């Protein structure tokens, strides 16, 4: 199995870039991870729905064929670290070729992306910036694989 993260926008804050790079490198020990950064639509005079649609079009074009798609959304299903680990393990056992996780931009995801997703998942009931969400997601993926492998990182 491979993991693809489709992310709207770049990490512009140094400590987030460093943290994300660290967890991306750690994840590579378990399976190939690819992060695709998509152009963030400028807000200017554009309304939020227009921005979501434009970013959504770019996201939909980049979803790999045959991939199981998880879109991050504030109204998505909340999962614990253990449940995420179980989901990762299930997809590895079922030989899912690729798991694609989508992080929208500042205004979230358009309905078309949410409808395309096989699962909507929430990282937290609190609002996170899309840049912070990337770091949290990478850490949780790493934590999930350490749980699956019974490695000493996650404290039960």
UniProtKB/Swiss-Prot annotation:
Keywords: Cytoplasm, Methyltransferase, rRNA processing, S-adenosyl-L-methionine, Transferase. One of its GO terms (cellular component) is cytoplasm. InterPro entries: Alpha/beta_knot_MTases (IPR029028), RlmH-like (IPR003742), tRNA_m1G_MTases_N (IPR029026). It catalyses: pseudouridine(1915) in 23S rRNA + S-adenosyl-L-methionine = N(3)-methylpseudouridine(1915) in 23S rRNA + S-adenosyl-L-homocysteine + H(+). Pfam families: SPOUT_MTase (PF02590). Its EC number is 2.1.1.177. S-adenosyl-L-methionine binds at residues 72, 104, 123-128. It is found in: Cytoplasm. GO terms for molecular function: rRNA (pseudouridine-N3-)-methyltransferase activity. It is an enzyme of class 2 (transferase). Its main location: cytoplasm. Belongs to the RNA methyltransferase RlmH family. Homodimer. Specifically methylates the pseudouridine at position 1915 (m3Psi1915) in 23S rRNA. This is Ribosomal RNA large subunit methyltransferase H. It comes from Syntrophotalea carbinolica (strain DSM 2380 / NBRC 103641 / GraBd1) (Pelobacter carbinolicus).
């Amino acid at each position: 199995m491979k993991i693809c993260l489709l992310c709207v926008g770049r990490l512009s804050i140094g400590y987030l870039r460093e943290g994300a790079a660290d967890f991306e490198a750690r994840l590579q020990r378990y399976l190939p991870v690819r992060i695709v950064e998509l152009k963030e639509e400028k807000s200017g005079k554009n309304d939020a729905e227009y921005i979501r649609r434009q970013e959504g079009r770019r996201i939909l074009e980049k979803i790999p064929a045959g991939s199981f798609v998880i879109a991050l959304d504030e109204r998505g299903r909340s999962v614990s670290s253990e449940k995420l680990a179980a989901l990762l393990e299930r997809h590895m056992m079922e030989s899912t070729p690729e798991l694609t996780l989508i992080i929208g931009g500042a205004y979230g995801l358009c309905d078309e992306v949410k409808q395309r997703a096989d699962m909507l998942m929430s990282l937290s009931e609190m609002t996170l910036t899309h840049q912070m969400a990337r770091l949290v997601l990478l850490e949780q993926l790493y934590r999930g694989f350490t749980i699956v492998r019974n490695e000493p990182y996650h404290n039960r």
